[in-house]
């Protein structure tokens, strides 16, 4: 059952079509959001919000022979500065287009609206400060009781000028990072080198502890190795096996090689007289060796 309900019916919240001046620095595009009254209603209902769809209508106001590229960026200010970009569009300055971006995240109504639209122009023969286009942004929001997984839908560009084609435009959207499991670290107050707290190994019938253990692996999966090993599949599997399971072949060794010898309870205990005899013999050997080396020096 879909828990989303439209905030403003099924209509888009539209900003006024506004003229923008050409600049080489990123400048904001006006994006209209719900009124304070509407946001208060959603807050009272205890719901969160989601940006369903953003449409940016670009209409140029430049001469026939104008050159340059317009770059429109959509950002989410909740992330760190270097990772805020969510999508980016590029198109010729003389091309009329509609840019479509479909959201992939929710946000709290108690926070400031995290979305920003920015534009800039590069490699243009149009002077800075000249009004070069009209831009209108339309926004569609929805409210939900709680967040759910959102199916990714790629952004699109609708070209309205006949003199331009798909090879004149480009767009990009951010990818989802690969999930990495982070192992639990040592308890507070313990040394890092003492090793992690491993869970007991479950040995099933027909298995050995050596084949199931992973002694020798890194104590943390926080970082991935920057080096790539260029070997074939068979060698790669063997390498990974030896690295992750260094004791896999321990059970195949003969029992004699694994026998540490008699235990303390099985060996004959030494008396004080035996220990004194060993010390006396050792001292005598050291004295004899020292005297021999002294004669050689003379």
From Swiss-Prot:
Its main location: host cell. InterPro entries: Gemini_BL. Phosphorylated. Keywords: DNA-binding, Host cell membrane, Host endoplasmic reticulum, Host membrane, Host microsome, Membrane, Phosphoprotein, Transport, Viral movement protein. GO terms for biological process: transport of virus in host, cell to cell. GO terms for cellular component: host cell endoplasmic reticulum membrane; host cell plasma membrane; membrane. Residues 253-273 are annotated as: Disordered. Pfam families: Gemini_BL1 (PF00845). The keyword Transport applies. It is a peripheral membrane protein. Binds to dimeric supercoiled plasmid DNA. Belongs to the begomovirus movement protein BC1 family. Transports viral genome to neighboring plant cells directly through plasmosdesmata, without any budding. The movement protein allows efficient cell to cell propagation, by bypassing the host cell wall barrier. Begomovirus genome is shuttled out of nucleus by Nuclear shuttle protein (NSP) and the movement protein transports the DNA-NSP complex to cell plasmodesmata and facilitates further movement across the cell wall. This is Movement protein BC1. It comes from African cassava mosaic virus (isolate Nigerian).
